[in-house]
Amino acid sequence: MDSDEGYNYEFDDEEECSEDSGADEHEDDLELGEVELVEAGLSGSERAGICGEGGGSALGPGPGGEEEEDYRYEVLTAEQILQHMVECIREVNEVIQNPATITRILLSHFNWDKEKLMERYFDGNLEKLFSECHVINPSKKSRTRQMNTRSSAQDMPCQICYLNYPNSYFTGLECGHKFCMQCWSEYLTTKIIEEGMGQTISCPAHGCDILVDDNTVMRLITDSKVKLKYQHLITNSFVECNRLLKWCPAPDCHHVVKVQYPDAKPVRCKCGRQFCFNCGENWHDPVKCKWLKKWIKKCDDDSETSNWIAANTKECPKCHVTIEKDGGCNHMVCRNQNCKAEFCWVCLGPWEPHGSAWYNCNRYNEDDAKAARDAQERSRAALQRYLFYCNRYMNHMQSLRFEHKLYAQVKQKMEEMQQHNMSWIEVQFLKKAVDVLCQCRSTLMYTYVFAFYLKKNNQSIIFENNQADLENATEVLSGYLERDISQDSLQDIKQKVQDKYRYCESRRRVLLLHVHEGYEKDLWEYIED
């Protein structure tokens, strides 16, 4: 291995990767570049072009949108993340004095916990440590250099492709296994691009578990896209292992948000994506991360399909095939060719004792029949309840997508108004109204998740009243904004829009404050699903 003392990565000017270390004691000494203030309570990213992008440190809003507390964070670029990573490696190397790429592998093995690495490093068993980390102790004499005794002009076969090349065309790791550079390049490219491996790429020799160091990878790969992918992969664990760092969940965004303490608070990336730092989902006030996670799982898995089957079908009492009733008669005949059982849909008993009771079962009140019917009714009620909340959740989600498209329409309306002797400041009420509308849609969407898991009590009734009031006002505001605004109706509609979005803001604040008050005073009781 040709080990360089430096740890240099050159990032593509047009693309970035990201990574960050633990709670870095010396992070204040790093030049993190300029940061911007971000209002974390604003709505989604689609307003680019009307609203500016966010980034840098932020003031976190209170539950109603007001800035009740500081929740500061930084949005870090690839270079800034790499600075943190290199600084962490440098701090460790000041003590253990190994090549930087070896130290990076050691830190990765210990999930970037410097204290754990130091403790193991000085416990007196270095050979065991390096063996566990799958690297050769750099203090040992290199077997690779001992083997380089052939003349560079003498050809030798590669043990992968079996083609002959000069000795100078071969390279390897400290384990002593050498292969031609072409095979190395193709091997590394396959591992990085197709298998998504970065920090755990081992020597291609059969049975050898020695890891490929970063300098070797960067030296043997010539494709800049593969290098960039590798940079993303090796730094990923750096972010994932640090509770103060979180990747932006937006597709193709490689920024990282760094906070001073982890919490379920809204943060906004420079790309415009606002998300919950705790769970990484879109900001979901007023529902807590725990319940949102359960809701998403419930929506994604087949549990509701099972509920529908339980509510609308029954099993044949003989062969247990699932049967759906498609007529009014209770006389059921199993269509399974190997069964053909005849039974009563109501009590699931054999049909023969029923005589002429084609539409009514006189054994309806028997314990077994009652238990089966009660179970079916419970399943049906659970399904109907789920569909009630799910439909409203999805409706607001769909409306929110439509509302985001309003930004483009509003921008056009604002430009038209300015051409009719209105100033820029006079038309800003439209943008503000769409901002409020999107905030209300998002809040309403997540109130239905909150309500789904909420047990009924006096406080839940107040919550539902607040929810209904906000929902009605939001629909009225949406209707105002979708109207065609003529010059004659401008002043009238302007007053209505301003009054309504201010009312929506107020009602949204009341709803959120009530929910958060319930959290603080432990007023809410939940249905465990």
UniProtKB/Swiss-Prot annotation:
Q: Which of this chain's residues are annotated to bind Zn(2+) 5?
A: C316, C319, C334, C339
Q: What is the regulation of this protein's activity?
A: Autoinhibited by the ariadne domain, which masks the second RING-type zinc finger that contains the active site and inhibits the E3 activity. Inhibition is relieved upon binding to neddylated cullin-RING ubiquitin ligase complexes, which activate the E3 ligase activity of ARIH1.
Note what the entry says on domains. Members of the RBR family are atypical E3 ligases. They interact with the E2 conjugating enzyme UBE2L3 and function like HECT-type E3 enzymes: they bind E2s via the first RING-type zinc finger, but require an obligate trans-thiolation step during the ubiquitin transfer, requiring a conserved active site Cys residue in the second RING-type zinc finger. The active site probably forms a thioester intermediate with ubiquitin taken from the active-site cysteine of the E2 before ultimately transferring it to a Lys residue on the substrate. The Ariadne domain inhibits activity by masking the second RING-type zinc finger that contains the active site.
The UniProt catalytic activity note for this protein reads: [E2 ubiquitin-conjugating enzyme]-S-ubiquitinyl-L-cysteine + [acceptor protein]-L-lysine = [E2 ubiquitin-conjugating enzyme]-L-cysteine + [acceptor protein]-N(6)-ubiquitinyl-L-lysine
Residues noted as binding Zn(2+) 6 in the record, renumbered to the chain: C344, C347, H354, C361
Organism encoding this protein: Xenopus tropicalis (Western clawed frog)
Give the protein name, as stated in the record.
E3 ubiquitin-protein ligase arih1
Gene that specifies this protein = arih1
Location within or outside the cell: Cytoplasm; Nucleus
Q: Where is the composition biased (Gly residues)?
A: 51-64
